[in-house]
Amino acid sequence: GFASSFAASTFGIKPVLLAGTEEQKKAYGARLAEGQISAMCLTEPQSGSDMGNTKCRAVKDGDEYVLNGTKCFITNGGIADIYTVAASTSPELGSAGISLFIVDRNTPGVSVGKEEDKLGIRTSNTTDVIFQDVRIPATNLIGEENKGFAISQKLLARTRPTGMASALGVAQRALDLAVDYAQQRVTFGKPIASRQAIKFKLADMEIRLQTARAQLFYNAQQIDKGIYD
């Protein structure tokens, strides 16, 4: 849970580092360095992570944008100080009409909805985030208007290995516990680890674990080379 929260905070500020202005990087990077928390607001109740169907709207009004919409399943949603929000600025363009914005938690119109009662990762805060007539300065646009989808794809390519590493650690721990239990649990005078059926299960777990680890290391090497596809 803690790993998810830390990763999500990095995830939230990454678009600024990838495509933000120097002013944005200095202002919001400094706030995170001081201990503030960020969150990435992509997922929506009706469209999930399909950015082409994003219903959250950002309408230009002078030197501001007016933001309306609801995001769901947002990691750090209830505790973040800074949100990066994906919103449609040109609905007729689908995913090509998405833009990213920096939104401060204390901006009027920003509220936190329900917190998810999750089966696992319960120490990681996950909530709805609601934007109702939220006015944000045009200077909070990350990159160019309608370039949010492209920025998000770069973001996901760089951050997915982090999630994979976390899942790999959980899987390794599960295998370690399974092996330990199989060696201790005795049936008919022998540890169940000596039973062929159990050996098969443990071997399959190890194969899948090593395959995932090899994939993660390969992805990390590609990123080190500047290859993100």
Protein language model regions, located:
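A structural signal for short hydrophobic beta-strand segments in well-ordered beta-sheet cores
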Residues: 56-59
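A short core secondary-structure module
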Residues: 64, 68-112
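Glycine-rich beta->alpha junctions and the first turn(s) of the following alpha-helix
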Residues: 89, 110-211
